[in-house]
Structures are given as structure tokens and as C-alpha cells.
Amino acid sequence: MTTMTTAAAKAAEPTRTTAIASLHLLAELEGHSSRAWHLAWNPRMPILASCSGDKDVRLHAYSFVSTTSAQGASTCKHPSFNLREVIPTGHQRTVRQVAWSPDGKILATASFDSTVGIWERIQDIDGSSELQGNTDASGPVVLSNGGAHVDEPEWDCVGTLEGHESECKSVAFSYTGGVLASCSRDKSVWIWEVQPDAEFECLSVLMEHSQDVKVVAWHPNDEVLASASYDDAIKLYIDDPSDDWFCYTTLTGHESTVWSISFSPCGNYLASASDDLTVRIWRRLDADQCEAHGLRPEGKMAGRRGEKWIAVNILNGYHDRTVYSVSWGVDKTSTRPGNLGRIASGGGDGRICVYEVTASDDEKSLQPKVELIAKMERAHASADVNCVSWAPESLNARGGTTAKIEQLTDEGETLNKGGQHASHELMSDMLASAGDDGSVKVWTLASSAYAATSK
């Protein structure tokens, strides 16, 4: 069990700048008839999925639209969102969470009816089309029952995963897409193997938590699974090829329910959000670092030297009520050395906070520097913020076809900047939030080029 060293962690609370910027609203996406619970950006297509207590999943497509200055010069492209499709999932109760596979071809839905729904794009099922994102805002959209949708469904349910004995709270694909994890109020974490033709086989059922399991999340580049629970703990799991999946460490220190967890893009840190009003940052030390600091590595087995996760920061005093969600995204605009990205947090106080994270100037220090750089009060009026989620850095497939940037622009042009697509830098500036008011909102930092060009 990994026990937090509070003296070290408390010393690293984030600094407050003299003037904290607010967030700039890019889009407000309404339509859910009940609270919006969760969001997921498709990693391959320009689509943002949201789920709700109304049992529907709404797919919002986005494109990048050019704006022109008063002098007639073309300026930065900003995102424009439109409702692409409403999926009536058929779940009997709330859809609590949604997740995309890394190739963007599978959507999973976790429901309070204890099941996980598996959805595939119809054109991919029949093989009639290469995976592409249709972002044409003037496409075949009609109004029906107060909400627009495409004429024909684009996504179809191809399977239902059963086994949980109570509400299913979370679902997540591994970075390879070969494994799916789900968790439930029944205190269990299930691990499923993703097979061809939407076949899923249960590989393991883990009963490590003593209470309701709130969320599961995969490491961005390793087969490491994390889960967080009503029992205030975070557990990490790996697969022993000669045996089974097992919990190799438990992270303790939170004083109440852990609602959300998010790995850093580099994979060496983990952020967690809790009912104790804090966000905590944990750092992974490899075997050599453990030896240098006199710590014993955990998770050792054949071919694996082990590691240890320790608490290094407590972000306290930034939320007045439960912190329900945390998301760690890429920061492509930072010029600071040791850039580790940005953390966003949202909670029951209706506030969204954004923190910049950088490595310490002191090479001997294990604590990153954390600075509050933006804050949005009443992000969803008086409603709770249930989820915050940074957009992906770019729409690239792992080991597969790349979604061309032309699909994201209104002019079909490729925007080159320093050998990269300019929009790749800016995509990660988008932050989506979901609230108890049923709405989904898309924000950006006031310093972002989007804020200057959006209407």
C-alpha cells in the first residue's frame, strides 16, 4: 500500500497569480432533458459525445471556420459545433459515462442499468466507407422533438456487456484498444478483451475496493489500469501474463470519495479529484528513482522492474464543494521549460479551475510546480459541473489511418506551421464541460487564439 507523505505534498500547493483569467465560452450545446454526466472527444473524428440521465448520447460535430479581420485579413480558424446525431441508447436507466476506442470506431456506454453498450459506426460495420468525420454544418440535419439529428442513424448497437450486479459507473479503453475496463456500484472492476466483430470476453473480475467504484482510467502508454472509489482509495492494476490481473498498489490520502482520476499525457503523473475538496497529484517513480530515494518498488515481476507512486501535490482551497472531475491535457502553447500540460477541475460549486503544471527547477525535487491560471465561476449557472474534458492534441490514429486535417477546415486547406498542422496546436486549447443543467459547454483560455477570433 502506498501511503502519502503529507509533509512533502502540502508544501507544493499551487501558487496564485495576481490576476486570474476567466475562461472564454466557445459553444453552448443544449438538448439533454436531464443532467449531463460525462463527455468524450473522439480521438479520430471531430466529434464530442455527451451522455445524460435522459438515457441518450448526443454526438456534436465540430469544424474550424475562418474569420476575417476588419482589414480583410484572414485570421485564425475557430471551432464551430453542430448536433450530428442523437443516439437513443435503449438503456433502461441513466447513461453515466461514454468512452471511445483509440481508433474512434467503437463507442462504449456505461449505464445505471448495470450494462455496458457497445456501438459501432454503421458504415464501418458493412465496410462501405473509410472512417471519416462529417463536419458539414449545412448537412442533412432536421429538427425533431426539439432537437436536430441526421436523417439516418450513423451508429448502431452491436453488443451489450452484462455481468455487473449494480449500477455501472465508468468504462474506458486501454491505449491499444485491445482491452476495455468497467466498474460498478457492486465494488467490482471488470476487464474485457476486445475481439473482432464486436466480441468481448471477460478476462478478469477484480474485487479490490470495499465500496462503490466510481471511475476507471487507463495509463496513456502502458497497460496499467487505475480505479477510484467511495472507499477514498485509488488502486492500480497490471496483468501478470502467467496468472491474472492484480492490484499492485493502493494510493491513500484522500479523506473522502475519489470521483475522478486522469493520467498526465507523459504518464508519469496521476491527478485525482475528491469529495474532500482537493485535487491531488501523484508521481510515478521507476526502479532507479526508487533506489535513489530509498523506496521499495511495487509491481515487480518477470520483465518488469516495478515502480512506486507517491503523492507530491495537494491542490487545496480552489473548490468550495466536491470536486467531481479532473482532466489532464496537453499544453502546446507553453514555452516554459519542463511543461507537463494543464489540469482542469470542476465541481459541485459550479466552478472550473485550470492549472499549469511544470517540472521543478530543482532536479532533486519530485514535486512539479502548479499554478492556477484560469477560473470560471458559475460555469453552468447554479448547477454542478459533473465533467471537464480537454480536447485531444490532434485527430491521429495509433498505427492506422490519420484523419486528415482537411476534414477539420471549412476550406479544405492544410495549415502548415513549423512542420505541424496549426490546428493541432489549438485543438488542445478546447475544454468541454457537462453540468446538472443538462448543457454541454466548450471553453478556451482567454489567452488562446480561439478567444480572439470566435464571435
Swiss-Prot record:
A biological-process GO annotation: iron-sulfur cluster assembly
Repeat in keyword set: yes
Endpoints of the signal sequence: none
Purpose of the protein: Essential component of the cytosolic iron-sulfur (Fe/S) protein assembly machinery. Required for the maturation of extramitochondrial Fe/S proteins.
Presence of the UniProt keyword Repeat in the record: yes
GO cellular component terms attached to this protein's record: cytosolic [4Fe-4S] assembly targeting complex
Keywords: Repeat, WD repeat
Organism, scientific name: Mycosarcoma maydis (Corn smut fungus)
Identification of the protein by name: Probable cytosolic iron-sulfur protein assembly protein 1
